Amino acid sequence: MSALGSRETHVLTTIIESYITSAAPVGSRTVSRRSGLALSPASMRNTMSDLTDMGFLEQPHTSAGRIPTPKAFRLYVDALLRQSARRDEAPLHMVEALHGHEPEVGALLRRASNLVSEHARQVSMVLAPGPAEARLRSLDFVPAGEGLVLAVLVLEGGMVRTRLVRDDTHFGSDELVRFGNYINAHYRGHTLSGIRNSIHHELSGGGAQLEAMCAQALALGSLALDSIDDDRELYVNGTRNILDQAEFAELGRMRELMDALEERSRLLELLDRTILEDDVHVTFYPDDVSGGAQRRAPDGLRGCSMVSAPYGGASPLGVIGVIGPVRMDYRKVLPLVGAVSRVLTQLLRERFATG
C-alpha cells in the first residue's frame, strides 16, 4: 500500500481484515487491540478520520465504526497480488487433488470448480476451452438418412462434437469410412482451427492437384468442421455459499444475485474479458466495469468482486473465477485461484495447442 504511510497502511489493513471477518463496522478500540500499534485513542481516531477523508473508509449513519470502501479494497488487493506474484509453485495438495483425476476435460474442470468453491466458500466458475484449439483424435462419417451424413468428432481430452451435414452426392457407407480414414491419417493430432485452414487451402487450389476421393473427403470434412461452433461450457459451483454471506441475508438481494448467476451469456462475457490478463486479476462490480450497456455487469453483481485467472499458458484456454462479496477473504482466494490455474495449465497444455 505504497500510497499511504506505514501507520495508515497498518490501520487500514487491520480495518479491512476485521471487516472481512465480521461484516460489521470496525471501531477504534477494535483497531487498537488488533493492530498492535502503540497509539493513543485520540491518535487512532485521527488516523481513521484521515483515512475517511482520503476516501478509504466510510461511516454508516448508525454506527461510530468504519467500513472500507472499494478504493480501500483495491489498494489492499493490489498489495496482495504483488505478494502472490512471487509464488510460482502450486501447493502440493492442489496438484494431488487434480492430478490423476478424470482424464476427460469436462470432468477435470468440474472437479476444479468444485475444489475452488469448497476452499473459498464462495461461488466458483470455470470457463472451458472452446473446440477450435483442441486436437483431433478422430473424425468419422455415418450415413444418417436421405442426403444427410452424421459427422462424429472426438477431440483430445474427451470432447465429442456431432454434426449433421448435407450429402447431395449420396455417398455409401464404405466411401464415408474411407473419407474418415483419409482425414484421420492426415490430420490426427492437429487443432481444429489448423485443420480448417489446411482444408480450405487445399480445396481452393493452394495445394497439389487432388485426387477425386481426396477432394470429396476434404469437402465433407470442411462442411463438418465449419459447422462446429466455438460454444464453451461454463461450470458453476457453490451457489449455496451465498446463503452464508451477510451481504445477501435480505431475500430480495439474494434473489438478485442468484438471477445474475443464471445469466450464462453475461457470465461468459465477464470471464472472457479477463482471459488475456497475465495472472490473477480482481474486478470490483460495478466500479471496474466500463463501456456501454452491452458491457455492463448484471445489476445483481453490485457490491461483488470476481477473482479470476486464465489457464493454458501463452495462449489461454479458459478462465477460472470466484465471485463473492467485496468482503471476501482475498488472502485465501487469491493464491487458491492462482494455484488451480497453474495446475490446469500443466494438465491441459498437452491436449491443446498452448504455449
Swiss-Prot record:
Keyword Transcription regulation part of the UniProt annotation: yes
- Tell me which domain of life the UniProt entry assigns to the organism this sequence originates from: Bacteria
GO molecular function, a single term: DNA binding
Q: Which GO terms describe its biological process?
A: negative regulation of DNA-templated transcription
Gene3D superfamilies named among the record's database cross-references: 3.30.450.40, Winged helix-like DNA-binding domain superfamily/Winged helix DNA-binding domain
Record's keyword terms, sorted: Repressor, Stress response, Transcription, Transcription regulation
State the function annotated in the UniProt record.
Negative regulator of class I heat shock genes (grpE-dnaK-dnaJ and groELS operons). Prevents heat-shock induction of these operons.
Record's family? Belongs to the HrcA family.
What name does this protein carry?
Heat-inducible transcription repressor HrcA
Tell me the gene name: hrcA
